[in-house]
């Protein structure tokens, strides 16, 4: 089975749907398709179904610029985000272009044919399917959907209760009245604890957040009161645009302040924790051993985690795991924490391009040896884009302008009769650091060796800066001397 499309998008999550909407709106006559491994669209927001799952960025900036998020809720729940993505796909007619249940294994470029051949397997039937396209766009994110990161905990087989990972939450898990230990201190852990603990029916008897080291945690309002008031008098579009611009500025200023005055911002963040939990709190449980934004900050709506801890329904323990026991976890300090259920909120496994192999003119494409061009295209990879969002701001801010840039690129190629566009480095700009070099999170460190390289200068640097990226992607000339164009197969030789 072989089908040809002008544009083929791998992944029907937040980035894939957004990119498809851009291309469909700009080029209504182009044939496009999305290949999605799961049986529903939504990507992360269909996969993650653990209690309390929500965005960790405000929805004004996490939503698409071209389709406003029309709610004053700041951090939305996972089901609402998935529905927003689905509604967007329906509105733009993208939902009809998705091929579900397909695991893409290889993509092979032929300079002679000027096209990609993409091979995958329909997992429900085992049928091999082949697609060809003029332009290929990967929107698969950067983590492995099959398995989250799980350290090799000693004695885990001895534990008599149930051990689960948030990435694959069991639908039948009943934690009501149970003693729960959540291992971890990142965004997933600080979301799970208040969602599972408390006095509501179905809540756990007690939840212990067991962390090796603390993370920075700060509170955001659950509801955007300013937008709520403005919405009574102004059109939704105006309210959304104001809220979006304001929040982009706040995100950027917070990040810049943490980088410029890290010790001051550290004191302010810790002061806020002490203010919410009281002066008697053991601050060693909330004082990280790194500076703000060396790792991503954890946002909690209306301080829900702090309220849960203050109520006694949950607690925090900072220690290291010696071994799992029949009844729970024995820490290196000698303390044993009893548990009926252990949740290993221990992070993600990095995976590039959804695990897809790239082959360019018969040669294996070595992604860790290449750089990204403007954070969107890949060095020496013809007619290929890779959409990756921000790690220091809302993911969608970057994926949105990347989709708009691709439309500019495709328009430039069409207007000038080009069939191929390939970024080439003629100045040896590659550095021996990964593209996320500004972030020291565990999952980034574990995945350094499989990521593309960071470049020494533009356009090979990954900036993680919305205003600068917006100018580069939306305003700067497409033809910059680094991006090489060819009008026919014989004019193009891939490196």
From Swiss-Prot:
GO terms for molecular function: flavin adenine dinucleotide binding; N,N-dimethylaniline monooxygenase activity; NADP binding. One of its GO terms (biological process) is response to acidic pH. Its EC number is 1.14.13.-. GO terms for cellular component: peptidoglycan-based cell wall. Keywords: FAD, Flavoprotein, Monooxygenase, Oxidoreductase. Signal peptide: none annotated. Binds 1 FAD per subunit. Its cofactor is FAD. The record marks 296 as: Transition state stabilizer. InterPro entries: FAD-binding_MO (IPR051820), FAD/NAD-bd_sf (IPR036188), Flavin_mOase-like (IPR020946). Disruption phenotype: Inactivation of the mymA operon causes altered cell wall structure, reduced contents and altered composition of mycolic acids along with the accumulation of saturated C24 and C26 fatty acids, and enhanced susceptibility to antibiotics, detergents and acidic pH. Also impairs ability to survive in macrophages. Gene3D superfamilies: FAD/NAD(P)-binding domain. Induction: Expression is controlled by VirS. Induced at acidic pH and in macrophages. Required for maintaining the appropriate mycolic acid composition and permeability of the envelope on its exposure to acidic pH. Belongs to the FAD-binding monooxygenase family. This is Putative FAD-containing monooxygenase MymA. The lineage of its organism: Bacteria, Bacillati, Actinomycetota, Actinomycetes, Mycobacteriales. The gene is mymA.
């Amino acid at each position: 089975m072989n089908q040809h499309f002008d544009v083929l998008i791998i992944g029907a999550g937040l980035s894939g749907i957004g990119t498809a909407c851009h291309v469909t709106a700009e080029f209504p006559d182009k044939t496009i398709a999305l290949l999605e491994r799961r049986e529903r669209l939504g990507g992360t927001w269909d996969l993650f179904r653990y209690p309390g799952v929500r965005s960790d960025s405000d929805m004004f900036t996490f939503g698409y610029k071209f389709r406003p998020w029309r709610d004053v809720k700041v951090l939305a729940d996972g089901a609402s985000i998935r529905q927003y993505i689905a509604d967007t796909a329906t509105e733009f007619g993208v939902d009809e272009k998705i091929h579900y249940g397909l695991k893409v294994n290889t993509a092979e470029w032929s300079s002679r044919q000027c096209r990609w051949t993409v091979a995958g397997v329909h997992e429900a039937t085992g049928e091999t399917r082949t697609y060809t396209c003029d332009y290929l766009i990967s929107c698969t994110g950067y983590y492995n959907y099959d398995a989250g990161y799980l350290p090799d905990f000693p004695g885990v087989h001895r534990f008599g209760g149930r051990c689960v990972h948030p990435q694959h939450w069991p639908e039948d898990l009943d934690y009501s009245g149970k003693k729960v230990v959540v291992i971890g201190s990142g965004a997933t852990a600080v979301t799970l604890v208040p969602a599972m603990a408390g006095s509501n029916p179905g809540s756990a008897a007690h939840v212990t957040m067991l962390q090796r080291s603390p993370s920075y945690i700060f509170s955001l309002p659950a509801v955007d009161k300013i937008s709520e008031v403005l919405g009574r008098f102004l059109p939704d579009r105006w309210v959304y645009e104001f809220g979006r611009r304001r929040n982009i500025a706040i995100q950027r200023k917070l990040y810049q302040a943490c980088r410029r005055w890290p010790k001051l911002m550290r004191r302010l963040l810790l002061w806020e924790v002490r203010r919410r939990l009281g002066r008697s709190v053991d601050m060693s449980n909330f004082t990280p051993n790194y500076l703000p934004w060396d790792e991503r900050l954890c946002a909690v709506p209306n301080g829900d985690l702090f309220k849960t801890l203050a109520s006694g329904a949950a607690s925090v323990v900072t220690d290291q795991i010696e071994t799992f026991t029949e009844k729970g976890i024995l820490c290196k300090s000698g303390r044993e924490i009893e548990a009926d259920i252990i949740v290993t909120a221990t992070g993600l496994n990095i995976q590039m391009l959804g695990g897809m192999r790239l082959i360019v003119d018969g040669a294996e494409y070595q992604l860790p040896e290449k750089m990204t061009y403007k954070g969107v295209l890949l060095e020496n990879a013809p007619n290929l884009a890779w959409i990756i969002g921000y790690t220091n701001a809302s993911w969608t801010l970057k994926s949105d302008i990347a989709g708009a840039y691709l439309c500019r690129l495709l328009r430039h190629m069409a207007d000038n009769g080009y069939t191929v566009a390939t970024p080439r480095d003629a100045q040896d700009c590659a550095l021996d650091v990964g593209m996320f070099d500004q972030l020291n999170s565990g999952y980034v460190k574990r995945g350094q060796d499989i990521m593309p390289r960071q470049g020494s200068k533009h356009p090979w640097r990954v900036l993680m800066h919305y205003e600068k990226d917006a100018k580069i992607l939306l305003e700067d000339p497409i033809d910059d001397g680094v991006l090489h164009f060819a009008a026919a197969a014989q004019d193009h030789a891939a490196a």
